[in-house]
Regions:
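Hydrophobic/aromatic beta-strand elements that line small-molecule binding cavities or substrate pockets
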Residues: 18-20, 52-53, 77-83, 108-115
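A short, structured loop/turn motif at beta-sheet edges
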Residues: 26-27, 56-58, 82-89, 113-122
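Short beta-edge strand/loop motif at the mouth of beta-sheet-based domains
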Residues: 17, 37-74
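Intrinsic-disorder/low-complexity, polar/charged segments enriched in Ser/Thr/Lys/Arg/Asp/Glu/Gln
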Residues: 13-19, 26, 62, 76, ...
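Hydrophobic ligand-binding cavity/cleft-lining segments
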Residues: 1-49
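Beta-strand/loop substructures that line and gate deep hydrophobic ligand-binding cavities in soluble
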Residues: 99-145
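Short, highly charged C-terminal tails/helix-capping segments
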Residues: 158-164
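Hydrophobic pocket/interface hotspot
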Residues: 29, 39, 63, 81, ...
Length: 164
């Protein structure tokens, strides 16, 4: 298994590309990205945790969640689902938000693709930023390191999953 993630920044297109493989079946990986009770187990870099206030995984639906720091600090975000093809692809608009669910623009458009490779699953993520400045600020704030740590949480969770 490859423990690394391919993380590429393309300033010309204002996109970030992340490619990874997980030693888990596609259903388990899909569920990890689309079910709030599973997302909250891995979707934050330690020692932070994820707390979903509500999630409606359907086109036009939203996930409203916070990343909660060890001191109780809450950083809220909202994801608005724009396209879903089960176990293949989903897309959403992501933006930081206040505690009342008001997005703080600009945001970014995420496109996640899932490929069944038998006993493993490939996930390709493309993140389009509305402005180069937003993308550069996101990278400067430690997005690569934070999201890589978050994906390592997912990998560890999937590897320790008990079938059934």
């Amino acid at each position: 298994m490859n423990n690394n993630f391919d993380f590429t920044v393309d300033k010309a297109s204002k996109k970030v590309f992340i490619d990874m493989d997980f030693d888990a079946d596609i259903s388990s990986v899909w569920d990890a990205f689309t079910r709030p009770e599973i997302l909250d187990q891995w979707y934050a870099p330690k020692p932070w945790t994820s707390k979903t206030k509500h999630m409606n995984f359907e086109v036009g639906g939203r996930r409203f969640y916070a990343m909660v720091g060890p001191d109780g600090t809450e950083m809220w975000a909202v994801q608005e689902y724009t396209s879903i093809t089960p176990k293949t692809n989903f897309q959403f608009f992501n933006a930081f938000a206040d505690k009342d669910e008001n997005p703080q623009l600009p945001g970014s458009d995420w496109d996640l693709n899932f490929t069944d490779q038998g006993e493993s699953t490939k996930v390709n993520i493309s993140i389009y930023n509305e402005s180069l400045e937003r993308m550069e600020r996101m990278i400067a704030m430690g997005f690569k390191e934070g999201f890589t740590a978050t994906l390592q949480n997912l990998r560890a969770m999937l590897e320790n999953k008990v079938p059934g």
